[in-house]
């Protein structure tokens, strides 16, 4: 599929549900110590994503955009500021952003010149690794806002997400010292349209938060099933079921209608399953 190298904000707004948006904002800073960086962050993308956050991205970014962080996507070497990882290592990083080959990626920046320098650098990086459906958002986030595009100001957008996600934090069923009362949990599930007797498949990143929600759901009379592999397994074995275009989570479910409720990190996916009548 051929795509335009440069796309206008109005087009992005109109095609928002069919693209994967990446924020390539980067704040200039002195080059990191090579030995220290390699010891702490080299090919340790989870650590980097937890510790090397960009304040501009956290303050404001396009709704649903993940941050393509130059301080993580590349590494410093003796003679290069932004050294390229191997294709396998790079793929491991961008999968954490919910990016898979075949997605139409739209990359934007901010600040001077609309952030086109950083966005273009990210563009050519993806092209180097064989990603062909990549575009740059002309004018960056400021132009997007002028086109009535939606932005958000929080730090929970990174990571893999499902289409039409509805957040259901573990805090809906757990308090600081343990599970909430059954009546409170009943109300929390009911608020999401999940009632006694419904069958749900519950999953999260690695199965921890989902286990607690699954237990609370079972206590509330819901037929709760835990998907052990979680988003982590899906990212490697069935990435087509992730990243804004999810239509089915489990291959065996062929005659069921699924509504997805996704959570990031300490959140979980609850999939309400109803038989088609």
Curated annotation (Swiss-Prot):
EC class: transferase
Its EC number(s): 2.8.1.1
Entry GO CC: mitochondrion
Disulfide pairings: none
CDD domains recorded: TST_Repeat_1
Record's keyword terms, sorted: Repeat, Transferase
Catalytic function, reaction form: thiosulfate + hydrogen cyanide = thiocyanate + sulfite + 2 H(+)
GO molecular function: 3-mercaptopyruvate sulfurtransferase activity; thiosulfate-cyanide sulfurtransferase activity
Rhodanese domain ranges (all copies): 15-153, 155-243
Recorded superkingdom: Eukaryota
Induction remarks: Expression increased by knockdown of mpst-1.
Residues at the catalytic site: 204 (cysteine persulfide intermediate)
InterPro entries: Rhodanese-like_dom, Rhodanese-like_dom_sf, TST/MPST-like
Domain comment (free text): Contains two rhodanese domains with different primary structures but with near identical secondary structure conformations suggesting a common evolutionary origin. Only the C-terminal rhodanese domain contains the catalytic cysteine residue.
Name this polypeptide is given: Putative thiosulfate sulfurtransferase mpst-4
Organism listed in the record: Caenorhabditis elegans
């Amino acid at each position: 599929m051929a795509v335009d190298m440069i796309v206008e904000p109005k087009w992005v707004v109109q095609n928002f549900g069919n693209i994967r948006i990446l924020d390539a904002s980067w704040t200039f800073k002195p080059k990191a110590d090579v030995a220290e960086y390699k010891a702490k962050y080299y090919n340790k993308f989870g650590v980097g994503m937890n510790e090397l956050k960009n304040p501009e991205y956290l303050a404001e970014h396009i709704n649903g955009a993940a941050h393509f962080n130059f301080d993580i996507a590349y590494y410093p070497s003796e003679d290069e500021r932004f050294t390229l990882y191997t294709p396998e290592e790079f793929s491991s990083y961008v999968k954490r952003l919910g990016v898979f080959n075949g997605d139409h990626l739209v990359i934007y920046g901010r600040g001077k010149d609309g952030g086109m320098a950083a966005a273009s650098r990210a563009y050519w990086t993806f092209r180097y690794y064989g990603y062909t459906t990549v575009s740059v958002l002309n004018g960056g986030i400021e132009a997007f806002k002028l086109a009535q595009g939606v932005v958000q100001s929080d730090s929970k957008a990174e990571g893999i997400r499902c289409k039409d996600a509805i957040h259901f934090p573990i805090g809906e069923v757990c308090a600081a010292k343990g599970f909430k009362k059954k009546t409170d949990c009943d109300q929390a599930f009911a608020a999401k349209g999940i009632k006694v007797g419904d069958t749900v498949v519950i999953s999260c990143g690695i199965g921890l938060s989902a286990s607690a929600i699954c237990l609370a759901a079972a206590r509330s009379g819901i037929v709760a099933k835990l998907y052990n592999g979680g988003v982590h397994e899906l990212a490697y074995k069935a990435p087509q079921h992730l990243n804004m275009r999810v239509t089915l989570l489990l291959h065996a479910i062929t005659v069921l209608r699924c509504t997805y409720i996704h959570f990031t990190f300490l959140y979980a996916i609850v999939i309400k399953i109803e038989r088609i009548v």
